Amino acid sequence: QFQITSNVLSGLTHIDAELVARGDLAESWEVTDDGKEYTFKLREGVTFHDGADFTAEDVVFSFERAKSETSAMKELLTSIVEIRAVDDHTVEFVTDGPNPILPNNFTNLFIMDKGWTEANNTVNVQDFEGGEITYATTNANGTGPYVLQSRAPDVKTVMVKNDNYWGIDQFPMDVTEIVY
């Protein structure tokens, strides 16, 4: 599942070959001296696969969704007490205390298009353990290097190269199709 998700959706950060958190959808971030506030500057000009602009509102929405009671990712975010969009390309996270691994935790949290998610009735996190299938189980609208072309869970997944990927110059992509 992670291999599929991480090729279609992107997070604020990723772990590089030296196991250091680096910016993905975030260009940079700063932490206050007391370690309680993180300010992330987002990449400008990034679009979702359907052409919608990626903004700070998508980040706030995705993290609030990930903090929800039914989310399997909520434990990674327990120290966050507030998330706010400062402007279209800046997000602030306020924590209950210093959390030096927070940028590392963000590598496991993928940003969803708020508008797409609302339009497709997938705002609530699906019940994986209960076997729930939602529109987001078989469809996606991400910012990642590959576009989900088709998905039949536990049968076959096809992804094709995203020619509009923001990082295409930094990460040459020779593979045009991935089939699981």
Regions found by a protein language model. Give the residues of each.
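N-terminal lobe/hinge region of extracytoplasmic solute-binding protein
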Residues: 1-33, 64, 141
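A structural "hinge/loop" feature
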Residues: 1-3, 25-27, 52, 102-114, ...
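Sec-exported extracytoplasmic/periplasmic mature domains
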Residues: 13-17, 34, 47, 59, ...
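Gly/Pro-rich hinge or "lid" segments in bacterial periplasmic/extracellular proteins
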Residues: 16-20, 109-170
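Aromatic- and charge-enriched surface segment that lines or borders ligand/interaction sites
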Residues: 27-72, 86, 92, 178
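Short helix-initiation/N-cap motifs at beta->coil->alpha
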Residues: 35, 78, 141, 177-180
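Surface-exposed binding/hinge segments that line
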Residues: 41, 75-125, 150-152
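Ligand-site clamp/hinge motif
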Residues: 43, 65, 162-180
